[in-house]
Amino acid sequence: MQIAVYSGSFDPLHIGHLAVLAYLNGRFDKVLLVVSPQNPFKGAEKAANATARLSAAREAVERHPELARVEVCDIEFQMSAPQYTFRTLDALQALYPSDTLTLVIGG
């Protein structure tokens, strides 16, 4: 299976992110929208509540049936800080050992 991994703070998740997700949805078997609880390179005091951002991402994906292959992923909420991308990819590869992961950046 081909899996796109689209991670970020999504603070907030906006129409540009949704456009990227729609593009990926048509090109991959699965798209993981990985919401990061805390970007290690940004100050926590400026970020919206992590749980609220995760919930908002889930609600946004649910409102868009054209994003049927998109799954909001909370794996970084289960990991110890700091959540660096390479650690997240290692954890995801352990969950999907026979699949190909593609990291998507930007939006």
Predicted features along the sequence, with ranges:
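Nucleotidyltransferase catalytic core that binds NTPs
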Residues: 1-107
